[in-house]
From Swiss-Prot:
<keyword id="KW-0560">Oxidoreductase</keyword>
<keyword id="KW-0288">FMN</keyword>
<keyword id="KW-0520">NAD</keyword>
<dbReference type="Pfam" id="PF03358">
    <property type="entry name" value="FMN_red"/>
</dbReference>
<feature type="binding site">
    <location>
        <position position="13"/>
    </location>
    <ligand>
        <name>NAD(+)</name>
    </ligand>
</feature>
<dbReference type="GO" id="GO:0010181">
    <property type="term" value="F:FMN binding"/>
</dbReference>
<dbReference type="GO" id="GO:0005886">
    <property type="term" value="C:plasma membrane"/>
</dbReference>
<dbReference type="InterPro" id="IPR008254">
    <property type="entry name" value="Flavodoxin/NO_synth"/>
</dbReference>
<dbReference type="GO" id="GO:0003955">
    <property type="term" value="F:NAD(P)H dehydrogenase (quinone) activity"/>
</dbReference>
<dbReference type="GO" id="GO:0050136">
    <property type="term" value="F:NADH:ubiquinone reductase (non-electrogenic) activity"/>
</dbReference>
<keyword id="KW-0521">NADP</keyword>
<keyword id="KW-0285">Flavoprotein</keyword>
<keyword id="KW-0346">Stress response</keyword>
<keyword id="KW-0472">Membrane</keyword>
<keyword id="KW-1003">Cell membrane</keyword>
<dbReference type="GO" id="GO:0006979">
    <property type="term" value="P:response to oxidative stress"/>
</dbReference>
<dbReference type="GO" id="GO:0008753">
    <property type="term" value="F:NADPH dehydrogenase (quinone) activity"/>
</dbReference>
Length: 204
């Protein structure tokens, strides 16, 4: 039976989504792993999104809280809002009370990735504050650490991400994820999928 890894994200302008796509590719590259992209529901009205010049949403399906229980592992992604995850993703997690009550996600591995507007915009604080959500569900936080190797020490060019997970900087919105950031995202997907597969195999 395939190991299921769900990449669940919220993306307003597409930066997080691009990382999510690479993470899915990385996870799917692990033999025996089925990787699937999911979006969390939008909480803003179309009128508000239009005023914010947000592009149309992608075709990735909208996930419901109960569908989380189907997966063996996760990678959660979101843009940063004042050093924390975006409210849309927090609203989705707030709706997982039934799963929490049953501890349906306990023992399942999960990683985190993110996008911020600037280098001091809260990439690590976003990950740190998001970990509390995993803890209450009994999930296992899987950081990438320095497993990405030399790419973690890039100093010549601006690069998002950290030992906590893959990341990118959006700037004024015109900056897109770099090739190195996308490579780090692919690595994160591959890394977490491998760990998820091992954990599932040890409990089979």
């Amino acid at each position: 039976m395939a190991t299921k890894v769900y990449i669940v994200y919220y993306s307003m302008y597409g930066h997080v989504e691009k990382l999510a796509e690479e993470i899915r590719k990385g996870a799917a590259s692990v033999e025996g792993v089925e990787a699937k992209l999911w979006q969390v529901p939008e909480t803003l009205h179309e009128e508000a999104l239009s005023k914010m010049s947000a592009p149309p949403k992608s075709e990735s399906p909208i996930i419901t809280p109960n569908e989380l229980a189907e997966a063996d592992g996760f990678v959660f992604g979101f843009p940063t809002r004042f050093g924390m995850m975006a409210a849309q993703f927090k609203a989705f997690l707030d709706a997982t009370g039934g799963l929490w009550r049953a501890q349906a996600l306990a023992g399942k591995p999960a990683g985190i990735f993110y996008s911020t507007g600037s280098q001091g915009g809260g990439q690590e604080t976003t990950a740190l504050t998001a970990i509390t959500q995993l803890v209450h569900h009994g999930m296992l936080f899987v950081p990438i650490g320095y497993t990405f190797g030399a790419g973690m020490f890039e100093m010549e060019n601006v690069k998002g991400g950290s030992p906590y997970g893959a990341g990118t900087f959006a700037g004024d919105g015109s900056r897109q994820p770099t090739e190195l950031e996308l490579q780090q995202a692919f690595h994160q997907g591959q890394y977490i999928a491998s760990i998820t597969k091992k954990l599932k195999g040890s409990t089979a």
